Amino acid sequence: MLREHAMYTHHCFVLACCLGAALPAPASDLFAPAELSDQELSQLRGRYVLPGRIVSFGVTMSSTWQNASGQVLGARVDLQVRQNLARPVLNVTLVDRPGDAPPPVAGNGQVLGGAGLAQTQGVSQSIRTAGDHNSASNGVSIEVRHGEAPPPLSGGTPLEGALALSGETGTVKVTPNGGALQLAIQASGQGASLQSLGAGGLVQSVALSGNRNLVQNLAALEVMLKDRPGADPALNCAWEQLRALRPSGY
């Protein structure tokens, strides 16, 4: 039986906005400045903070696939921006861990359809499975913390183009593509997963054709802000003077 779950939104998601401007198609121009149009600016919503209060800003995208034999294939992409860095840092970590048993038998399930999932805008999350006893999840998290010291920089390989890792478990590939960053896993005989962030959207998809797999896609935004400074007496005085002008019609 084919079970499908999909969710779409039509508003530009904040994570996609962050990487969309930082990931033009050529790998050599990953951090070239990109001007936002008036239409894009008109869609921005939320609260704003002064740049001096931002200690660090980071976007993480990770995918892992564990098959029935315990073999794990995956990747993690970290984009980090902080005050003392001249340019953003974009690192990739590829994972291929052996299991405690031979590779599982290829699944015989077929996942059909779903071509329209690649044509959506905004946020698209889908999990489709034609196997049994599988567990899969797509997740998005946003965390805002307060502090003075930024978290340590993540390790990994700087992303200067496509990176890939292949083995008996399958293939994992991280690729800048069309203004977005794609993280794709092709698990041998078990299915495939994809995350794509940028170009105005976020896509998370899982298609399972085998059995007893554990698949996770996660995109996370983390911001650290300085604690709000104490009130400036001169600023409070100016504010009181402005309030006093209200009865006069100003």
Curated annotation (Swiss-Prot):
N-terminal signal peptide: 1-27
Localization annotation: Fimbrium; Secreted
GO CC aspect terms: extracellular region; pilus
Domain of life: Bacteria
Key words of the record: Amyloid, Cell adhesion, Fimbrium, Secreted, Signal
Deletion phenotype: Deletion of the entire fapA-fapF six-gene locus shows no visible growth phenotype.
Record-level GO BP terms: amyloid fibril formation; cell adhesion
Its job: A minor component of the functional amyloid in this bacterium. Upon overexpression of the endogenous six-gene locus (fapA-fapF), cells form large clumps during liquid growth, make large amounts of biofilm and produce amyloid fibrils.
Subunit structure as annotated in this protein's UniProt entry: A minor component of purified amyloid fibrils. Fibrils are resistant to boiling in 2% (weight/vol) SDS and require >90% (vol/vol) formic acid to dissolve.
Family of the protein in this entry: Belongs to the FapE family.
Name recorded for this polypeptide: Functional amyloid sbunit FapE
